[in-house]
Amino acid sequence: MSITRRTTLSKYLIEQQRETHNLPADLRLLIEVVARACKAISYNVSKGALGDALGTAGSENVQGEVQKKLDILSNEILLDANEWGGNLAAMASEEMETFFPIPANYPRGEYLLVFDPLDGSSNIDVNVSIGTIFSVLRCPDGQQATEQSFLQPGTEQVAAGYAVYGPQTVFVLTTGNGVNCFTLDREVGSWVLTQSNLRIPEDTREYAINASNARHWYDPVKRYVDELNAGAEGPRGENFNMRWIASMVADVHRILNRGGIFMYPADKRTPDRPGKLRLMYEANPMSFIVEQAGGAATTGLKRILDVQPTGLHQRVPVILGSKNEVERVARYHQEAQS
């Protein structure tokens, strides 16, 4: 009787460490701790109303957004799991105004962890897929982190990933050597490699955008979406479908698996605040993953990974996904400026 050998996340990381020689042991251990925290978050999400974790917490985060109970719980799970391991100098989160230095009573490491503990949390109460997004940077100041230590462009990321808590719980990871997907086997509690070297098709007929904001869009985005909506009779000569989950991890995961373009552009409502998504813990890690899978990511005017951050909670426009479509939108932005 043959036994199918399965590759767990731990085995995969150890093999990468041996084969590529560019995955330090501390980084491998850090990724495993983050993945373990995501398992705990998945467990709490799956309990739903049975865990008394639905609804709002009666507080707001630094962006002025109402915090859900699971937002706060997920943030605490990630902090508690990572503060004592000796791999980190500091952490930063969507749910905290300032960064979190590793307490003096724990050993400190050379890495910085930035995360959105529960992306798409507006969907919690209606049981739509949500997730966790994270990014890992090296601390340029050794083990004494400051806020400035975090303000590195996305090209400096050494690892990035996300978990999706949906019909299956999956963990998607890149360390700069392609993108792989692991599925949580709840019977044994292990992450098992289920998709290797994911690639985003260069062309697509699907797009994701919140069309209710159409009246606020700037001309390049309006031009692009109008062309898609014109269908086979329009300038593109083919029909396109719109998909919008209002959960970035879910929308990006779909694009990673079957192609598409995701857009959360700047609009005219807030000209002084370019975009809604946060650069450090949403746009950068997702852009790293998308580029590693053969896609592209831009603000419309600049490659997202080249943006120099000015603050932990900086916002940027985000257009990412299938390469040819992203490049078309970028070209429309450039033409509008010329």
From Swiss-Prot:
Gene Ontology, cellular component aspect: cytosol
A single MF term (Gene Ontology): fructose 1,6-bisphosphate 1-phosphatase activity
Binding annotation for Mg(2+) 2: D116, D119, E282
Coiled coil: none
Binding site for Mg(2+) 1: E94, D116, L118
GO biological process: fructose 1,6-bisphosphate metabolic process; fructose 6-phosphate metabolic process; fructose metabolic process; gluconeogenesis; sucrose biosynthetic process
Cofactor(s), by name: Mg(2+)
Residues annotated to bind substrate: D119, G120, S121, S122, N210, K276
Listed Pfam families: FBPase (PF00316), FBPase_C (PF18913)
Catalyzed reactions per annotation: beta-D-fructose 1,6-bisphosphate + H2O = beta-D-fructose 6-phosphate + phosphate
Pathway entry: Carbohydrate biosynthesis; gluconeogenesis
Subcellular location(s) per record: Cytoplasm
Family matches, as InterPro entries: FBPase_C_dom, FBPase_class-1, FBPase_N, FBPtase
Enzyme class of the recorded protein, top EC level: hydrolase
Co-factor binding comment: Binds 2 magnesium ions per subunit.
Keyword terms of this UniProt record: Carbohydrate metabolism, Cytoplasm, Hydrolase, Magnesium, Metal-binding
Main location: cytoplasm
EC numbers, comma separated: 3.1.3.11
UniProt-listed NCBIfam families: PRK09293.1-1, PRK09293.1-3, PRK09293.1-4
HAMAP family: FBPase_class1
Protein family membership: Belongs to the FBPase class 1 family.
Subunit structure: Homotetramer.
Protein name: Fructose-1,6-bisphosphatase class 1
Gene: fbp
